[in-house]
């Protein structure tokens, strides 16, 4: 399928359930997501991914995110426009993300075990640490280095394709659409690639790699399984600049 022939639709709240379900399938083996949900078993994590994504994307929508789907939901993205930030504490609370944290914490409690307040607090604090202090701290530092002082930028919160439709240029069509939007506004695009495959795609579309970030270094393996002294899971902070277009857009 030629990239130019891919039909694309943009939307908002009404597309929430569809994109959350799609992301649950797309990111089923994503190492970064597995690390974020480390307190869950694989079975629990896979069952819970749509709920996890619903809360996160709802927060993105409260920050004026645009949901884009391509070719009848074969691929989709969530993009936050300049001025909106997924880390905004008030919108996270409003979106019910504390409920997600609570559920993640309870996943570590065995059936029949009496969940104590201290245990729930400990487990919930671990996911908060991974999200805010580790992930956000490292990516914020990369942004300071990579955005060259720019405060306004588009943020690709998620972008992915159904497993059976990968390699057909569908996600590439969505990204090219986003690049055209950013070019018109003369603003950069920021994202974090979470796999080698997505990193390669973005590099091919003119993105610049700013930094390889390792989460859980010394605690987990590259696939997010527990491993003392492990290398951690990788993600790549990347930026695209509009002054590289139009020639740089494939």
Where are these regions (language model features)?
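A short beta-loop-alpha structural element at the N-terminal edge
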Residues: 4-25, 29, 33
